[in-house]
Amino acid sequence: MSDVELAYAVGQTVEVTAVDVAQGGWCVARPEGLPVLFVRHALPGERVLARVTEVTSRFARADAIEVRDASPDRVEPPCPNAHPGGCGGCDWQHASLPAQRALKASVIAQQLRRVAGLELDAEITVEALPGDEPAEPGPTTETTESTETGQPGLGWRTRVQFAVRPDGLAGLRGHRSHEVIDIGDCPIAHPAIRDLGLLDYSWEGAGTVEAAVGSPEPADPGHQDSVVILTKAGRAPRGRRAPGSVPGNAAAHDERGRVARDRSEDRAVEFFPQEAVDSVEAESVLIRSAHRLTPLRGRQFLTQFAAGRHWQVNAGGFWQVHPAAADTLSEAVVAALEPKPGDTALDLYAGAGLFAGVLAPLVGADGAVTVIESDAAAVRDARANLGEYPWVAVHRNDVSLAVKDAGLPQARLVVADPPRAGLAREVVDYLTGGSQAERFAYVSCDPATLARDLGLLIAGGWRVDGLRAFDAFPMTHHVECVVTLTR
C-alpha cells in the first residue's frame, strides 16, 4: 500500500488548515505527518474538520464538514444544495464572487508556472462579465446586479442537463457521484430555464432532460427561444410500442402514455412521459439518439444574438452558456488578433462560426477566412451563419487532420477555441512548424491544458503577449482565458 492509503481511510475525519487552492475547485491541506489532502467546501486559510471521501495510491480527497476558523471571504451559499453530499454542480458558492475570481486567477498562475514555466509580467486578474462587474475596484468588493436575475453570479446558465432517476425525478448529480440529487431548483440556471419547470414533471423513461435557451436581441427581449432535449434511459420502461412511424413533428404515444419513435426511423425505440412532453412550455422538444436530434415539436436550432447579429446554433450544439460570454470573447479575440483589411485568418475548432463571423467583415472582401470544424451540425450552422461572406470558406474536417493537409491555406492570423482537452498535438506541431501565422488567439476553458499547450508553443518560437481571463462560469471552478501569442 502507498503512504496515502496507509494514512487515510474513507470516512475518517481530520482537522486541517487549507493552505492553497488547486485546480478543480479544491483546496490543498498539508496535515502534519500526513500526505497532502485535497479538500472541497473550504477556503485558503480556513481551519476545518474534513471527512475523507476518496483515497487513491497517490492522493486523498475530503469534504470540509465543519468550519472552525472561517475566512473573511466565506459567505452563505445562495443554493441550499451547495454543501457536502449535495449537488456537485458548483464549487465556490461559499466564497464571495471577488474571492472566487481571485481563486481562479491563482489557479491560472499556478498552472502557467508549474506546467509551462511561465511567469507573466502583469498580475492575472479574472474579469467579471457584463452584469457581474464589481461596483468598485478591490478584491472583496460586492458586485452590481446581474442583468438576468438581479443577483450577481446567478441566473446565467443558458443550458442545463438534468439527470433522471428511475422513478422519473429530474435533478443534478452529486460531486463525483452517480447519485441524482433532488435539488428542487437551480439558482445558476437562467430564469427562462427555471420557468420551464422541468423539475416539477416526471420524466420516467428518460436518462437525461436538457434545457437550453437562446439569447434575445436587445430590441426584442421578450422573445427567447427555448428547447428541451431528452435522451432515453439505459433501459426503456416496459410498454407496448405504438404502431407505425412518427412523421414530421407529430408525437405518437404507447398505451401507457410514453412517447414512442419508430425503430425503422431512429434505430431505437424512445419512451417518454406524454404529460411532461405535452405540458412543458418549451418552443421545441427533441429526442437525442445515436448522435441525432429528432423533433417531437418545434425546430432543431436556437437563435443566439451576439456581436450585433443573429446566429443559428444547433439545439444540441456548442454555444457559450453565459449570456455575455460570446460578445466578451469575440471582442477579446479581435483585440488579440488586430485584424486589418486584406488579412487572412484561420478559425480552428470553429463551432457555429462565431469568431470567423466577427473577423470576416474586418478582413473584408480582399481578405480570406478559412473555417475548420469536425461536427456536421456545427458545420451546417457555420455555413448558414457565414454565407453572406464569399471570402469565408467552411470545411468539415477533424482539425488534427486539416492542419496536416498541404492544401490548407496559409493565414497571418489564427484563432482556436478547442474543447477542454486543449489543442491536438498536430495543431501545436502545425503552429510551431508549417504555419506562417504571426498572431494567434488561443481561447481556453481549462488552465491545465492551456498551460501545457503554451509551454509547447513557447518552445516552438511563440511568445505570450497577453492573457485575459473571464469569469464566464460564476460559482464554479471553471474560467475562460484568451491568450495573445505572437512571433
Please place each PLM-identified region on the residue numbering.
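Accessory RNA-recognition modules of RNA-modification enzymes
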Residues: 1-416, 421-427, 436
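S-adenosylmethionine
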Residues: 395-481
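Conserved beta strand-loop-helix elements of the APE1-like EEP
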Residues: 482-487
